[in-house]
Swiss-Prot record:
The protein's name in its UniProt record: DNA-directed RNA polymerase subunit beta
Designated gene of the protein: rpoB
InterPro entries: DNA-dir_RNA_pol_bsu_external_1 (IPR019462), DNA-dir_RNA_pol_su2 (IPR015712), DNA-dir_RNAP_su2_dom (IPR007120), DNA-dir_RNAP_su2_hyb_sf (IPR037033), RNA_pol_bsu_bac (IPR010243), RNA_pol_bsu_CS (IPR007121), RNA_pol_bsu_protrusion (IPR007644), RNA_pol_Rpb2_2 (IPR007642)
Organism: Levilactobacillus brevis (strain ATCC 367 / BCRC 12310 / CIP 105137 / JCM 1170 / LMG 11437 / NCIMB 947 / NCTC 947) (Lactobacillus brevis)
Any single Pfam family the record assigns to this protein: RNA_pol_Rpb2_6
Catalytic reaction equation(s): RNA(n) + a ribonucleoside 5'-triphosphate = RNA(n+1) + diphosphate
Length: 1203
């Protein structure tokens, strides 16, 4: 027997075919959300207050400082917030200190800063009662970037961009004459030397002294001439720059200095963020720039004089190892330049300069200038950064240094929840800061308190806006646990500060070599977002700078053996190493088993020897995301189909009694455990009590833990979320163990579908184009039955004419329609309802009309009751029938928070039990999707020699052209697993080989080709050829025919065009388009076409008359003029074309004649008058014979919706 047994949780053992020893467990799969939010609460919030505070008034008399903050207990628990449509949030209190510098008085006060949304343990937020996820964003990292391009003459031109987190961009470029320019914030070009002069180095000699002489710099100096000799060079440059940035304004050196200081050197306006400083230091540091260059000077230890590297030495990794400690010192090869007093920044400029030989001409010395190891805490740009960037830019033209790839994951970073929230909070705080400053100058300094200065509205509004309407705050995908998990691990390049769909080219969307182990190369949506929305790989994590790291096993550099020491590397760091694949064969002592090893060096796949290997992958599945890692035999599937398989697993509907896959990949337990839908124990202990609603566990220290189970809760997508206990009384449970299965789980494992018996065969053409034939048993035995819960809401409000009332007494409704309502007119739990049934009886007062004498008498006798009311009951919409699962009533008397003007709210939940039926979409895990085309009686299905009928028939044509052979391997191994009675695990890229499958097939006593003879259930004859039959994990997807099928009888019309609305949600009509019209024209079906263009569309009067004729049984009248035709006529008249309609005798027909109307256009008032007459006639008829007209009234009240 190949394979070995592995336990997944306490309730499942699988035979695993993996060969590679796992040295690292998978991390917690939602830590990207939880870690980031916890960082925000612990550090991010405090950093932000420290940034904004202290706030001082314009005179500097008052200052408001931040002392501390605390989050109090949340108002609602998670479940209460869900029920009350509220936020799960905690009040934020901030302690502020107000200092009056004139009197020395200090006032401290606790100020309420609004309710702050809290993250649940599952990594989600509850906003207005709905679970939401904040998706992490992939953005370009702040830093210095260099790029190359080819101009129209075929010359290579270089460019550089300094990108801050917020603030002005700085760009360097050269023109066709090799003159270098700088642009500030995408404005007009400024010669680069002008910026250097503005920094305080006015003369040409000073500039050459700092930057060294090179061709482009000389050309620039020639162009940058001294025009106005009255001004010094520094002042002239400052004025020039000001003129380019603010054309038309009077230019002075002072205003230019303050403008440049505000643009670049004010930490409040220019922020590189720690990551920007880290990237800039890394890029401009001599440690990275000297590698591979030849020294043009001898470097010695400044203290001892000992030579570190002689002139002419090539700086390789070993030389750099001895050189690096010196380069980190503050005085090694540092040169200080003193700017003039007129400069923007007058502090001395410290640069680290080392001369190297030019690659083209060894005689030429080229300075390599570092930015002088600027402190990592410094957030804004320094003159040293600008000079060092210019030097890098000039060196590139000589072939020194390298350009950056913007799609490299070393240059793209993740903004997770914490940082996104911090940025949003900062916006709110800076708006508040303005208000505080204004109030400081207005209010009396002696009596003012912090509370009077603070207005928290902007802060609260910005947080509300972020959670409510940001592109990155999304309604959680709650179709099944895998969908939830994937949504929390999603990375989006879209959103504020990111890309837009239309501007994103192929390069951004493409798979990059740095995605390896960081972002899944397979899981991404099909369609316009392909490649812009990705998924985090299974082992990846995000470091403090927001870069994605992936773990590798360290290879000892002296023994060349693979150790169990794990290092997490970013994409930048990985570029320096050679990494071996996870499936490289090893000996027991960790040494490599083969002489040549397949490895990766940057973007190349190479074969190399053991002594060159630095690291080794930790696991074969570190390349892919969780959903992709759930696909067995992924290595045998084409990537396009694997993409569909990964995406469709997220759409699998939770079934009534799901089964974990017979052929899994071993990640099912971890995915279900971390998804947040399973019930997990918090402590070790023994189970004392179990029922469907709660589990009680006695801890070892004697305390009792009670766990409440989630029962039939409606998820975000209208699916049924339910938990079932899997422990028994007396069981010992460990901390972090699964106590109860959630939806789509079985025995603690992910169970998205079922394991039916599948045959690859045709059946009378019913398999054409991916259609699926299924056995009636799947319908009858509820194998693919799912429960769907829909929520409906009705509110009783105060109106101008009086309050609405929930009641059983509804006008013109028979007792039959009220049989399931209680005395308040609310439906009872457990009632079965159909489309159009009343769920909540509600009446709204009508406008008071002039009463007749008889009505006044009735009013006097019976009082209020004779008042006219309108029926505004909540009814079951089309296709919404089912069983009432729950009713929730909220009233002001019970202390429920309701929105203003609402006195009572009722929520009704209807559960539908949906069996699989023709038209439903199903799929396997390999992208093999199809729709059910026929349900075949069990006795007619093909059956196996032992009499077992097949469950599902798939078309064999779906395999060869799509190259997803994994489904066939799963089929064969699944059959063996079924016969052997075991569950199997075949991890991705490390699963069962063909020999393993052959052995399992043999062990199960199947034929060597794993096929079998099938017999026709109708005739009993065997089919000609042997058929591949086996077990495949097959899912029912959320695209169900019940949600899509739709037909319109009478419904609403668009106010503008007077044509029927579209779509199922609006109860709209089907579009009869251009091609469909051609089809009717081809058959000469003139009257059908006329009806479609008139009564069924926008002939306003005609359709009302037609409806009347149908109700009364009269012949249908002639159609009138469609509204769109009138529009056409008016359009042509507006163009000055006189258009007339003529009859057969060439006589003009007035459009009004065709409608027998007085007016050109049908008046809406006329329609409502007509409807009113209808209503009065109907009432008269109802009084004479109520029973006859009861069904008609229900329909007749509907045409009024067209207004």
């Amino acid at each position: 027997m190949a394979g070995h047994l592995v336990k997944y949780g306490k309730h499942r053992t699988r035979r695993s075919y993996s060969r590679i020893k796992e040295v690292l467990d998978l991390p917690n799969l939602i830590e990207i959300q939880t870690n980031s939010y916890n960082w925000f609460l612990d550090e991010g919030l405090r950093d932000m207050f420290d940034d904004i505070m202290p706030i001082e008034d314009f005179q500097g008399n008052l200052s408001l400082e931040f002392v501390d903050y605390q989050l109090l207990e949340p108002k609602y628990s998670v479940d209460e917030a869900r029920e009350h449509d509220a936020n799960y949030s905690a009040p934020l209190h901030v302690t502020l200190r107000l200092t009056n510098h004139e009197t020395g008085e200090i006032k401290s006060q606790d100020v309420f800063f609004g309710d702050f949304p809290l993250m649940t343990a599952q990594g989600t937020f509850i906003i207005n009662g709905a679970e939401r996820v904040i998706v992490s964003q992939l953005v370009r990292s702040p830093g210095v970037y260099f790029n190359e391009d080819t101009d129209k003459n075929g010359r290579t031109v270089y460019g550089a961009t300094v990108i801050p987190n917020r603030g002005a961009w700085l760009e360097f470029e050269t023109d066709a004459k090799n003159v270098s320019y700088v642009r500030i914030d995408r404005t007009r070009k400024i010669p680069m030397t002008e910026l250097v002069r503005a920094l305080g180095f006015g003369s040409d000699d000073e500039i050459l002294d700092i930057l060294g002489d090179n061709e482009s710099l000389m050309q620039t100096l020639e162009k940058d001439i001294h025009k106005n000799t009255d001004d010094s060079r520094v002042e002239e440059s400052l004025k020039d720059i000001y003129e380019r940035l603010r054309p038309g304004e009077p230019k002075t050196a002072d205003s230019s200095r303050s403008l440049l200081t505000a643009r670049f050197f004010d930490p409040k306006r220019y922020d590189m963020a720690p990551v920007g400083r880290y990237k800039t230091n890394k890029k401009l540091s001599l440690k990275t720039r000297l590698l591979g260059l030849t020294l043009a000077e001898t470097l010695a230890d400044p203290d001892t004089g000992e030579i570190i590297a002689a002139k002419g030495t090539v700086v390789d990794k070993d030389v750099m190892k001895s050189l690096a400690p010196f380069l980190d010192q503050d005085d090694f090869k540092m040169v200080t330049f003193q700017p003039s007093d007129e400069a923007v920044v007058t502090e001395p400029l410290k640069l680290q300069i080392i001369k190297v030989q030019s690659p083209d001409d060894p005689e030429q010395e080229v300075p390599v200038i570092g930015n002088g190891n600027i402190d990592i805490k410094l957030k804004h740009i320094r003159p040293a950064d600008i000079i060092a960037s210019m030097n890098y830019f000039f060196d590139l033209q000589l072939g020194i240094g390298n350009t950056d790839d913007i799609d490299h994951l070393g240059n793209r970073r993740i903004r997770s929840v914490g940082e996104l929230l911090q940025n949003q909070f900062r916006i709110g705080l800076s708006r508040m800061e303005r208000v505080v400053r204004e109030r400081m100058s207005i209010q009396d300094a002696a009596t003012v308190t912090p509370q009077q200065l603070i207005n928290i509205r902007p802060v609260v509004a910005s947080i509300k806006e972020f959670f409510g309407s940001s592109q990155l705050s999304q309604f959680m995908d709650q179709t099944n646990p895998l969908g939830e998990l994937t949504h929390k691990r999603r990375l989006s390049a879209l959103g504020p500060g990111g890309l837009t769909r239309d501007r994103a080219g192929y390069e951004v969307r493409d798979v990059h070599y740095t995605h390896y182990g960081r972002m899944c190369p397979i899981e991404t949506p099909e369609g316009p977002n392909i490649g812009l929305i990705n998924s985090l790989s299974s082992y990846a994590r995000v470091n403090k700078y927001g870069f994605i790291e992936t773990p590798y096993r360290r290879v000892s550099w002296d023994t060349h053996k693979v150790t169990d020491k794990i290092d997490y590397l970013t994409a930048d760091e990985e570029d320096n190493y050679v990494v071996a694949q996870a499936n490289t064969p090893l000996n027991d002592d960790g040494s490599f088993n083969t002489d040549t090893i397949m490895a990766r060096a940057q973007s190349e796949n190479i074969e190399t020897s053991a002594d060159r290997i630095d690291y080794m992958d930790v696991s074969p599945k570190q390349v892919v995301a969780v959903a992709t890692a759930c696909i067995p035999f992924l290595e045998n599937d084409d990537s396009n189909r694997a993409l569909m398989g990964a995406n469709m697993q997220r759409q699998a509907v939770p079934l009534l009694n799901p089964h974990a896959p017979l052929i899994g990949t071993g990640i099912e337990y971890k995915a279900a455990h971390d998804s947040g839908v399973a019930l997990i124990s918090q402590h070790d202990g023994t189970v004392e009590y179990v029922d469907a609603r709660e589990i009680r566990v006695r801890r070892e220290d004697g305390a009792l833990d009670t766990y409440k189970l989630m029962k039939f809760r409606r998820s975000n997508g209208g699916k049924n979320y339910n938990q079932r206990p899997i422990v028994k009384v007396g069981d010992h449970v460990d901390n972090d163990e699964v106590l109860a299965d959630g939806p789509s789980m079985e025995n603690g494992e992910l169970a998205l579908g079922q394991n039916p018996l599948v045959a690859f065969m045709t059946w009378q053409g019913y398999n054409f184009e991916d259609a699926i034939g299924i056995n009636e048993r799947l319908v009858r035995d509820d194998v693919y039955t799912s429960i769907h819960i829909e929520e409906y809401e009705s509110e009783a409000r105060d109106t101008k004419l009086g309050p609405e009332e929930m009641t059983r007494e509804i006008p013109n409704v028979g007792e039959d329609a009220l049989k399931n309502l209680d005395e308040d007119g609310i439906i009872r739990v457990g009632a079965e309802v159909q489309d159009g049934d009343i769920l909540v009886g509600k009446v709204t007062p009508k406008g008071v009309t002039e009463l007749s004498a008889e009505e006044r008498l009735l009013h006097a006798i019976f009082g209020e009751k004779a008042r006219e009311v309108r029926d505004t009951s909540l009814k079951v919409p089309h296709g919404g029938g089912g069983i009432i699962q729950d009713v929730k009533i909220f009233t002001r008397e019970n202390g429920d928070e309701l929105s203003p003007g609402v006195n009572m709210m009722v929520r009704v939940y209807i559960a539908q039990k949906r069996k699989i039926q023709v038209g439903d979409k199903m799929s396997g895990r390999h992208g093999n999707k199809g729709t059910v085309s026929v349900v075949i009686p069990e006795e007619d299905m093909p059956y196996m020699p032992d009499g077992t009928p097949i469950d599902i028939m798939l078309s064999p044509m779906g395999v060869p052209s799509r190259m997803n052979i994994g489904q066939v391997l799963e089929l064969h191994l699944g059959m063996a697993a079924r016969k052997l009675g075991v569950h199997m695990a075949t991890p991705v890229f490390d699963g069962a080989q063909d020999t393993d499958i052959a052995d399992a097939v043999k062990e199960a006593g199947m034929a060597a080709d794993a096929k079998t003879v099938l017999y026709d259930g109708r005739t009993g004859e065997p089919f000609d050829k042997r058929v591949a039959v086996g077990v495949m994990h097959y899912l029912k997807l959320a695209h169900m025919v019940d949600d899509k099928m739709h037909a319109r009888s009478i419904g609403p019309y668009s106010l503008v065009t007077q044509q029927p609305l579209g779509g199922k949600a609006q109860f709209g009509g089907q579009r009869f388009g251009e091609m469909e019209v051609w089809a009717l024209e081809a058959y000469g079906a003139a009257y059908t076409l006329q009806e479609i263009l008139t009564y069924k569309s926008d002939d306003v009067v005609g359709r009302v008359k037609t409806y009347e004729a149908i109700v009364k049984g009269d012949p249908i009248p002639k159609p009138g003029v469609p509204e769109s035709f009138r529009v056409l006529v008016k359009e042509l008249q507006s163009l000055g074309l006189d258009m007339k309609v003529l009859n057969g005798d060439k006589e003009e027909i007035e459009l009004r004649d065709m409608d027998d109307e007085d007016d050109d256009v049908v008046n809406v008032d006329a329609l409502s008058k007509y409807a009113q007459q209808q209503e009065e006639q109907r009432k008269a008829a109802a009084q004479t014979d109520e029973s006859k007209t009861a069904p008609a009234t229900k329909n007749e009240s509907q045409p009024n919706t067209q207004d």
